[in-house]
């Protein structure tokens, strides 16, 4: 019996050449709608779906393949005598190949002017039903949903006269990944439209961007996936202009650097190592900002990741060229800057839009046996809700330093302490199990610069010891959430040493 293929695709990439190959192998081709028209325009002989079903396409194409003659031909187990007898009795013929991809739902809802009705109309029903039927019966049916697989199937047909069982199984697995991702997009769109924030089930879908050489360590395998919709201000959708492929650790560090630099509207540069900032500087231009970020910690910046929120110019590029860096991220690079930096063949240069995340963005964190979902921490300092419990208020310069330190401390691993002075960080204490330990690290790093600086803490002081350490170092202003049952003890110490302290009422833990 002559083999048959059913072809109905929205992505018509390579389909004409593929169908030519099928016809050359003596395979009969059934097709529908626009696909049939395209194939016939290219001189290919195909059978209309209505000739198989004996029923016209109706309801604007909503009903065309949902028919027993189609699904019987797909689902029949060819070595089951009962199935074969029923097919013969009902005049059905088997379908051996299904080449289908689905209505462009993702592309439709990505349009800024999409209406709800447009989105609903682009939910495919017949396509998923066909490819699921074919994939279930993959022992007998080859199902192709991705044009990238056309050459593999044709090569095996030419060599063996049939598709290998292993290939059929791989194609079937791909089908169910394809339909799962498709349904996830639909369910997430409808869930968002209804404003449901915590649905009873959560289905997420990501698309493979690249295999990575290894994960956090060489013995760990890793892959990088991207969100299905373009997130312009992200590492996943950044454009790499130069350098080696990104590694797992590169991606994590670049993401951290990008998150911090988004906090600033003035020219700013952030240096990151192991997902913690080692230096942050702001200035009247990007060169001045970089100089301050470098001076914040000229030791730790070596081998680090740099993020800037302005174009990198030649003067800044020449300074960056002087040290070893893994990555530089910026909205753009001047032509002269690129010439300077591209002389380092391994230095990765990325361009990305710098846009602050919104609270609607979700952060996913995997735990053993589960997944945590929360809003991104995008809350900025609200000066209308702060309080100053100390006798002295911050000076104008102290306010500048406090604000800078507060923007940075929310991005430092808890327990987190950041010291800032004169438009730059001068000390960062990260990830300690007690708060005073982080304070001591930041103060030690700052050295003499701590005198007259501002301190930010990501959470309240459970005891006054951190304020005492700050006073010893000559720190003159502190910003922290407040809310401890022992706040009065910290306030008393601050007043004793003339330290101005600000309560924000907002905690910024980061784990």
Curated annotation (Swiss-Prot):
Coiled-coil annotated residue ranges, if any: none
Biological or metabolic pathway of the protein: Purine metabolism; IMP biosynthesis via de novo pathway; 5-formamido-1-(5-phospho-D-ribosyl)imidazole-4-carboxamide from 5-amino-1-(5-phospho-D-ribosyl)imidazole-4-carboxamide (10-formyl THF route): step 1/1; Purine metabolism; IMP biosynthesis via de novo pathway; IMP from 5-formamido-1-(5-phospho-D-ribosyl)imidazole-4-carboxamide: step 1/1
Superkingdom assignment: Bacteria
Keyword Hydrolase: yes
SMART domains: AICARFT_IMPCHas, MGS
Keywords recorded for this protein, A-Z: Hydrolase, Multifunctional enzyme, Purine biosynthesis, Transferase
Chain ranges of the MGS-like domain: 1-145
Reaction catalysis annotation: (6R)-10-formyltetrahydrofolate + 5-amino-1-(5-phospho-beta-D-ribosyl)imidazole-4-carboxamide = 5-formamido-1-(5-phospho-D-ribosyl)imidazole-4-carboxamide + (6S)-5,6,7,8-tetrahydrofolate; IMP + H2O = 5-formamido-1-(5-phospho-D-ribosyl)imidazole-4-carboxamide
GO MF terms held by the record: IMP cyclohydrolase activity; phosphoribosylaminoimidazolecarboxamide formyltransferase activity
Pfam family, one: AICARFT_IMPCHas
UniProt EC number: 2.1.2.3, 3.5.4.10
Family as reported in the entry's similarity comment: Belongs to the PurH family.
NCBIfam families: PRK00881.1 (NF002049), purH (TIGR00355)
Name this protein carries in UniProt: Bifunctional purine biosynthesis protein PurH
Organism encoding this protein: Bacillus cereus (strain 03BB102)
């Amino acid at each position: 019996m002559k083999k048959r293929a059913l072809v109905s695709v929205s992505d018509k990439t390579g389909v004409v050449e593929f169908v030519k190959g099928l016809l050359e192998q003596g395979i009969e081709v059934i097709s529908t709608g626009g696909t049939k028209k395209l194939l016939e325009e290219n001189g290919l002989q195909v059978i209309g779906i209505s000739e198989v079903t004996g029923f016209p396409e109706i309801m604007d194409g909503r009903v065309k393949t949902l028919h027993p003659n189609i699904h019987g031909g797909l689902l029949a187990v060819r070595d089951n005598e009962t199935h074969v007898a029923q097919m013969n009795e009902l005049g059905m013929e088997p379908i051996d190949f299904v080449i289908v991809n689905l209505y462009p739902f993702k592309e439709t809802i990505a349009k800024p002017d999409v209406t709800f009705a447009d989105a609903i109309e682009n939910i495919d029903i017949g396509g998923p039903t066909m490819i699921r039927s074919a994939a279930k019966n993959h022992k007998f049916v080859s199902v192709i949903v991705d044009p990238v697989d056309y050459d593999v199937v044709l090569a095996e047909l030419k060599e063996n006269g049939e598709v290998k069982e292993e290939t059929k199984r791989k194609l079937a697995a791909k089908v169910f990944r394809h339909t799962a991702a498709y349904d996830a997009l639909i369910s997430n769109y409808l869930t968002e439209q209804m404003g449901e924030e915590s649905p009873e089930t959560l289905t997420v879908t990501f698309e493979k961007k690249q295999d990575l050489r290894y994960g956090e360590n060489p013995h760990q395998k890793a892959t990088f996936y991207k969100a299905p919709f373009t997130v312009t201000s992200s590492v996943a959708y950044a454009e790499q202009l130069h350098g080696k492929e990104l590694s797992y650790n590169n991606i994590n560090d670049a993401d951290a650097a990008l998150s911090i630099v988004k906090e600033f509207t003035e020219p700013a540069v952030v240096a990151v190592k192991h997902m913690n900032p080692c230096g942050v500087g702001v200035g009247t231009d990007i060169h001045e900002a970089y100089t301050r970020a470098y001076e914040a910690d000229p030791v730790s910046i070596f081998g680090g990741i740099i993020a800037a929120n302005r174009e990198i110019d030649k003067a800044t590029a020449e300074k960056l060229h002087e040290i070893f860096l893994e990555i530089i991220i910026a909205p753009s690079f001047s032509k002269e800057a690129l010439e300077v930096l591209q002389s380092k063949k391994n230095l990765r240069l990325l361009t990305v839009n710098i846009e602050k995340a919104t609270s609607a963005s979700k952060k996913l964190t995997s735990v053993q046996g589960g997944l945590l979902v929360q809003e991104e921490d995008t809350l900025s300092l609200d000066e209308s809700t702060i309080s100053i419990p100390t006798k002295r208020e911050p000076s104008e310069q102290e306010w500048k330093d406090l604000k800078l330190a507060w923007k940075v401390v929310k991005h430092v691993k808890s327990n987190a302490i950041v010291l800032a002075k004169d438009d730059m960080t001068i000390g960062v204490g990260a990830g300690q199990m007690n708060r005073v330990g982080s304070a001591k690290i930041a103060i030690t790093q700052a050295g003499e610069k701590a005198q007259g600086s501002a301190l930010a803490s990501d959470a309240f002081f459970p005891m006054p010891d951190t304020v005492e350490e700050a006073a010893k170092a000559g720190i003159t202003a502190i910003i922290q959430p407040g809310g401890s049952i022992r706040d009065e003890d910290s306030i008393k110490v601050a007043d004793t040493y003339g330290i101005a302290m600000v309560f924000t009422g907002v905690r910024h833990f980061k784990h």
